[in-house]
Every structure is written in C-alpha cells, then in structure tokens.
Amino acid sequence: MSVFVKPSAIELTRIAEANIDYGKRTNNTMIYPIVIYGSQTLRNPSENIAPDYPDLEKLVEDMFLTLGEADGVGLAAPQIGKNIRLFVVDCTPWGEDHPELADYRRAFINAEIYERSEETSLFNEGCLSLPGLHEDVRRPVSIRMRYVDEKFVEHDEEFTGLPARVIQHEYDHIEGKVFTDRLSPLRRNLLKSKLQQLAGGKYRCSYKTK
C-alpha cells in the first residue's frame, strides 16, 4: 500500500509499448519515481488542491500509470514528491475474488474522513515507500469521507472492506503518516533497524525510486 502491493503482478503492455521513461514525459504520459521512507516529503503536511490546479486530470492519469508500473493498489501524491491532498486507488487486482472491485479505480482529492467505525480489523499492509516491509495493521472496518474527484465533483460516501482499508492507508500519507506509525511501540522498536536501512538507501525493489 503508498501503496499497498498488489496480490499479483499485472502486465502493463500499454506502458511497455509506449516505452515510457521514469521521470520523463513520453507520448504525453509520465511515470514518477517513488519517494522512499526517510524523505521529509512523506512527513510534511499536504495542502488542499484548488479547482484550477494545473493539469490535474493529467496528474491523476500519470499517478495511475505510476501505480500500475509499481504493482500497487494505492498511491498518494506525497509518494511522488507532491505535498497535495490527492491519492488514487486501484482495487481491480482483487476483482477475481471480489467481483464488486473488478472496475474499482478512483481518485480522491481534498479528502476528509469524518467518521470511523468502532469495529476494527487486522490486515497485512505493505507500501511502495517502504519496500520489502509488511506488517499487520489494525484499522476501522468502515469510514465516511468527503472528497472531490478529478472533475472536482463533490462526494460524501461510506466505504467498507478493502476499499476502506486502502483509502485509510493512502489518507495517512496526505496526513504525513506511514503505516508503521500505526504499529505498537514494541513492534516499531523491533523494526527500527529495517527502517534505518530504508532511510539509508539499503533496499531493493523493481520500480524506480528517489
């Protein structure tokens, strides 16, 4: 998860055929390098986006491309170096087991979670900004959230299940948090050396990073 890691890789032939370079625009598209744990960008507060934000729909499209190339299911703007309140979610990899998610691709702008269920659940999360690290994280089962989409249409919705899980993970990013912040002090202490290695650039992953 900023992202979850997809349960299975998806072959993005349209990207390969376009010969897109990371960090460069080709055929009017761009795949961004992912910001890794240790960068202050992941801790800075994110600002709301105005309706006249330059090329907003294009940025959303590029974020989905970046997400797909990295085999993730969620990506927040701070993970590509932009401290704005924007994240995208693609739950389609779960579509085979959960048909209702077969076409679930959404963009969330200026999101505000204002209600969380008392019921919680554990789920094993990962993050593109913390490659190689996966931990069981407890979160509310359902949430209510206000947001606007890439067309700046306002929404007020309830989310449950896997979408609620991914949304909360990405929402943390625009709040300057990462999923390890949700772990117990004891567990965080046990992960201290791994987190230091990530911050020091000692990691391996299949996508471009910065």
Describe each region flagged by the PLM.
Residues 4-168, 173-210:
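Active-site rim/adjacent substrate-binding subdomains
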